[in-house]
Amino acid sequence: MPVIGTFCVSVDKDVCVNAQSPGKCATCVEVCPYGVYEIDAQGQVHVNNYNTCVGCRICAEFCPANAIRINPAESEYLSRYPWTFGQIEEIHHKSLTGGYLLRGFGTAGPLPHFDGIVVVPSQLASESPRDKYREECQMEVVIGEDTAEEPITLRYPILFPAMSYGALSREAKLALAIGAAKTGIATNTGEGGVVPEEPYYANGYADPERKEQKWAPGGYLVIQWSTGRWGVSADYVNAGDAVEIKIGQGAKPGMGGHLLGAKVTEEIAAVRGIPVGSDALSPCRYYDVLSFEDMKKMVAFLRDVTDYKKPILMKLGPSRPYDDVRMAAEAGVDAISIDGICGGTGASPDVVTQGVGIPTIACIPPAVRALKDLGLHRKVKLIALGGIRNGLDAFKALAM
């Protein structure tokens, strides 16, 4: 793919009609208004002048074999902003279908993130470690030590966030459970119900009788309680080691969950309690929670259902971190997860994922301040979610 001008022009010779039969097709030559293509004496089409390509993609639209690709040689934000290809394609999609773009994953584009933060090291003014090998570091985190009979102790201050069965395959869910068991951390069911093997896999056992631990030291399973109540029962709530109340998430704050019907197989339908092939749509809020007092009652209800044995967590999206975290803490939960705009999802309107919420790094300081103002920052644990990609991101989040 030669790159000379602002745009890269590539032709897939394996599918190009002209490449297979010279002289048979020259649509790109005919429709390009800028002379990018030419046809030689043998009837073969070639890219003649890359510099004249303006990225209109008329050639790609008219190519009968869909063999042409036009991509920016530099960021679209420099070459085409604000009318990027993505913006144009979205307008076409809305015009043709009358609907919005629905996609997975998370936000894309230049948002403030952990890359813009650096770590200040120790030197003369503060004590430095002996070296990275011998310095002792206490990383255990206990959740629910003051309120639950069976608090959970994470070996490291990280966990796998909620990703539901359906958005992820059965194999992926069990792989996360085994990973949690091997590292001594927690994994989360998400709002789609629990895979039958998930609870004992997360605890490190390969069989439901839990006779012999296979994956040491063993981890934990957090059961998510969401607005859709998918697969919810007393047995479900007690299947794990902690319960998380889902209020929102980073990739689609202000909205409920959405699992596309194409992903709802017989097995997933059985777990969620819905018809095969139907979209699973969770409400944006709890219809039985109409006030702050109702929220406190929900926390108390879950403590009662779990016989006061399990910690209760709450997951928030990126809205008003200070006020939201303060209310969650006052409702009596043991830990609060706050998910920034860089978090992921299985399905969400593109316009919401791209344009609603606040960055993860902007969620953490006001959330910490809310707990400190209540005098609960040593009691209620704060969990930062959303685009934490590696150990350095995790370290920066902890430092904040």
Regions found by a protein language model. Name each.
Residues Q44-V47, G192, P196-Y201, K252-G256, ...:
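Glycine-rich, proline-tolerant flexible connector loops at the mouths of alpha/beta enzymes
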Residues M1-V3, A65-I158, A162-G254, L260-G261:
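Conserved, well-structured core domains of diverse proteins
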